[in-house]
């Protein structure tokens, strides 16, 4: 079954909160932020929250674009490519000072966190979730 809009939103929220949260806990101490560990954790989790909130908004745009496709879904690889426009928007918002609580973030730290988190979440969504949560796929990507 093709994921529904609400299924995509639920999947994004669950995977970013759980998988992205765990990955952020692991990777933050190794990021070249130049800040204290507490400040680094605050920044990385605020960036993750920004990605989640903007990602939910992106889903509405993606849903509208998918209506022009016969199968009403992206090919799997397109889901990976959306990393580019979403990452660029988050980076521009951070640089513009539009993300509350996030100061100056080095580009290298942002790229390491964003790209690796995106890849981990994408791999989990296209691997273990589809294997271990078979009902998730039959329910249009919804968890509840």
List PLM regions with ranges.
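Aromatic-rich, lipid-facing transmembrane alpha helices and their immediate juxtamembrane interface loops
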Residues: 1-144
């Amino acid at each position: 079954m093709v994921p529904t809009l609400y299924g995509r939103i639920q999947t994004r929220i669950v995977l970013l909160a759980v998988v992205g949260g765990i990955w952020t806990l692991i990777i933050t101490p190794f990021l070249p932020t130049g800040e204290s560990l507490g400040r680094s954790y605050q920044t990385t989790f605020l960036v993750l929250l920004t990605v989640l909130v903007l990602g939910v908004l992106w889903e509405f745009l993606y849903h509208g674009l998918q209506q022009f496709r016969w199968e009403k879904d992206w090919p799997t690889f397109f889901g990976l490519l959306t990393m580019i426009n979403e990452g660029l928007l988050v980076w521009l918002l951070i640089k513009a000072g539009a993300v509350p609580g996030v100061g100056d973030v080095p580009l290298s730290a942002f790229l390491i966190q964003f790209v690796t988190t995106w890849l981990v979440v994408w791999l989990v969504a296209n691997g273990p979730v589809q294997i271990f949560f078979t009902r998730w796929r039959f329910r249009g990507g919804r968890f509840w």
